[in-house]
Amino acid sequence: NLVQFKTLIMKIAGRSVVYKYFYYGCYCGWGGIGQPRDATDRCCFVHD
């Protein structure tokens, strides 16, 4: 979910940049269609 994603980003980046992922790729944000574009998008796909 988005809370877990925010926590993960905080641990890796040391700051909250989760808002930059809301419209990233095909699956980061709400819903999604098509093939995931990269590893980050695949992570969003798995958690959707």
Swiss-Prot record:
Task: Spell out the protein name for this chain.
Answer: Acidic phospholipase A2
Please tell me the species this chain comes from.
Answer: Bothrops pauloensis (Neuwied's lancehead)
Q: How is its activity regulated?
A: Inhibited by EDTA. Inhibited by Ba(2+), Cu(+), Fe(2+) and Zn(2+) ions and, to a lesser extent, by Mn(2+) and Mg(2+) ions.
Query: Its quaternary structure?
Result: Monomer.
Q: Which InterPro entries match?
A: PLipase_A2, PLipase_A2_dom, PLipase_A2_dom_sf
A GO molecular-function term, please?
A: toxin activity
Effect of pH on activity: Optimum pH is 7.0-8.5. Activity decreases rapidly at basic or acidic pH and is virtually absent at pH 12 and pH 3.5, respectively.
- Quote a single Gene Ontology cellular component term: extracellular region
